[in-house]
A protein has these predicted regions:
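Short coil-to-beta-strand
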Residues: 1-2, 102
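Short amphipathic alpha-helical segment that frequently serves as the phosphate-/nucleotide-binding helix
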Residues: 19-24
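An amphipathic, aromatic/His-enriched active-site/gating alpha helix that lines ligand/cofactor pockets
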Residues: 25, 29-37, 51-58, 62-103, ...
Length: 109
């Protein structure tokens, strides 16, 4: 398994539900193509005990892939920037503050 993690903020005026809909549509398409197994979208929940050097961003996503090879293939698919994925990706990305986005891939140790 490999997991892409993302941290970001929504642009002012963007409703959480609007982003969730766009993210779900994007991930459903990737699942239909055989790249993604599951995903999640969460909001940071500040906590006086758990918070040690927390991110400044409010939102988090994760996208799980069966393995590193499929994660790499998915990256190439998204980077190709072709329809129908282009519209789904741009619809989702237009809702986030680009300067706050951080994405990274993790694998089991």
């Amino acid at each position: 398994m490999a997991t892409m993690h993302g941290l970001f903020d929504l642009k002012p005026g963007i409703e959480v539900g609007a982003y969730r809909e766009a993210f779900e549509a994007f991930c459903r398409h990737l699942k239909e193509q055989g790249y993604v197994t599951r995903w999640s979208f969460m909001r940071r929940s500040p906590h006086p005990g758990y918070d040690r050097n927390p991110p400044e961003t409010a939102y988090y996503v994760s996208v799980d892939f069966p393995d590193r090879a499929i994660a790499e293939a998915c990256y190439r698919y998204v980077a190709a920037d072709e329809e129908p994925l282009r519209t789904l990706h741009r619809t989702m990305n237009r809702k986030v503050v680009p300067t706050t986005t951080r994405f990274f891939l993790f694998e089991p140790a």
